[in-house]
Amino acid sequence: MFSFFGGNKAPELTQEEKTKLILQQAYDFEVALRAMDYVLDDNPERGLNLLKESDDSANEDERTINVLARGVIEFLEATLSFEAEEMKKASATLAKAETLSQKSKANAEKLNLSNSSKYPPGTVFAVTYTESLLLHALLMIFSESMMEVAKALLKLRKAYYTLQEVLEQIKAANEASITNAENNGEESKSSSASFISEGDIFNSIDIPYKLTEEEAKDKELLEFADKVHKMRAKRLSGAHIDNPPAINRLRNDLGLQAMNSLPKEEIKEHLPLSDDVDRSQATIDEFIHSGVNLCFGILQVVLSLLPPAIGAVLSAVGFRGSREEGLRLVWKATKHRNVHGCIGLLGLMFYYDGPFQFTDDDFDVPASVKEYLNSTEDKKGQEENNDDTSTMTKDMESLKLKDDDLHMDSNTILHPGKILEDALLKSRALFPNSALWLLNEARMLSGKGRLEDAVALMDSIDVNSIQMRQVKTLMIFDRAITLIHLHEYDRAADDILSLLDISDWSHAFYSYFAGCCYLENWRMIQMGDLKSDKEEFYKEKATTLIFKSVDYLGKKTWRSKNLPLDRFVARKVDQFKAMQVKLNLTNPLDAIATGPVYEIAYFYNGFNRMSQKHLDISKKMLTEYKNPAVEANDPDQNLIRDLLVSLCLRRSDKIKEGCDLLDQKVLPTFFKELPDGKVEYVKKNEDPWLYPSALYERALFCWKLNGVQGLSECKEWLLRAQNYADDYELSSRVGMKIKAAIDRVDSALNN
């Protein structure tokens, strides 16, 4: 609406011009926040059109938030699909947002344009810069390439130090605000809690100073300020994206059955779903606060999960992360009713209930052994621990962002339970058209072992109606994963094969996955556990899909190197072919010993989610099925089988039996404890993921057998898992799970 920039030289602006520009920036941020919310409600076309309309009349500063918004949208699409082209596209947009943010920050400082009542000119663009850097770095980390992780560190470093500068500015501003309040009885730059008019004086929370008499009479200005105020009010209540009041859809429990408990009488008024929503914050201040919490929180968590070799280098230069503090800050970000809150919640869902589940259900260690044992807390030790806290963490503790009510203790951070569930249900109510939030609810159900309910929820939506292709892909993939935990292999295979037409992620893995499903059905028929006349069909499909899966690896034109799971598929097929030759077999399926579908189930945390019925089926298929490859007694195939059987036993409460199997059959083949207390690793590479995973699982057995008294030994096993190898097949996902477990044990032992 208002625009003043032109040419290369920054003009001298009058207060009236500055006021209009400040309101224009608040308006642009509201448009961008609304656009991103449309995307989160599965209406990407509407959201992107909003940004395009805003772009058509925008100057460079106004484009900054629009470009970042597009980058955020593309980041979500890329991290949902992990397709190389999507990641490349998002990276390019975020790189552009980085450049524009730097220019906009410099311009705001040159003009002394303060769009915040608290913070120096340009602060909001420092936040957009940090956000662009961080999201760009995350794309590199999610590539599961150690080389890309190393490159990402440069961006994380820039984000870290830029954020540190922002935190120092926020800290100084808050201290000055407190001093002014003490000296004057009120803050010198007060902001009203809503859009009001008092006589001839007009107040707006988006304008950080009193208007001049001329401005107070400027009808166009006042109407525009009112428009911005109403946009924010609608967003905070969820009325801005054309949905009926969210309060009518707010449930107390997960699953389709909980829909029956919704209120019968419809409420017509749009109301915020939480008392945590702060209506007194200006749009720019809200963006700064939520952005700082989100960025620093994610940064801390990411740093805490990096491989130890990289983490040691970073720590040496004061560049370290705290998982617990990071999670706490991300939780604070979720209290904001904007895209930062949504990204924060998606991150938390991925951490707690995602496919890798960094908080393993079997490793439910307490936050503090001392508290667990009801002993007196050592205050001196706590003070010493605080001394090790980074400068940035101390700065964060000094901030007063009206989120003091969200004090989450360590146990709640580890096991948020109902708090996380309620946060998700609010998002489901706010975004009723979104398959993304429905998928996250299904994941939470799956994480609780409610696999049938998870599938029923995913079945409740027509996947062809999902507008975001990446969400559609992920919905189908997650459903297939859940179905193999239920041994429903026909449906799982159908789902996975459908992805060949809509996703470019890994056609080799899709084909291999489907083939493994058909193979298991064929075996179950042979075992007499499945009545079907499709035995020959399953045999032919399994043979074709498994052994032809590697053909897809030679057809890639969009990616220079294979994904970790591609390399996994290539290695497995090579092993099967070698066994077929070794045993001189006619049927290639007879060259496959341990059921490969159970490896896939392990990668996606299946054994922690199966019911006793399905654990029993898995154990039976792993131990009782016979073919020439099984009878050949190949030691490497036996390792996979015995590891997976030990997990079935542990989840069946046969913990000692499972641990004995691991100790006697698995660990001795690649690990030895020497008399002097040292250990010796036998370096094996037949199944690279297995060896550190087995050491990790041994730590969990130790916890299950010995409880808190065995945590020190647990840590020893975890460190052994971490030290077995640096870079190996699937090392990113296995390594991060190990690192997260080490942090949890350290926290329990030291607090």
UniProtKB/Swiss-Prot annotation:
Family: Belongs to the IML2 family.
Organism field: Candida glabrata (strain ATCC 2001 / BCRC 20586 / JCM 3761 / NBRC 0622 / NRRL Y-65 / CBS 138)
Principal cellular location given in the protein's record: cytoplasm
Superkingdom in the source lineage: Eukaryota
Family matches, as InterPro entries: Iml2/TPR_39, TPR-like_helical_dom_sf
Name by which UniProt lists this protein: IML2-like protein CAGL0G03245g
Gene Ontology cellular-component annotations: cytosol; mitochondrial outer membrane; nucleus
Compartment(s): Cytoplasm; Nucleus
Pfam families reported for this sequence: Iml2-TPR_39
Main function: May be involved in mitochondrial DNA stability.
Keyword annotations from UniProtKB, A to Z: Cytoplasm, Nucleus, Phosphoprotein
Keyword Phosphoprotein: yes
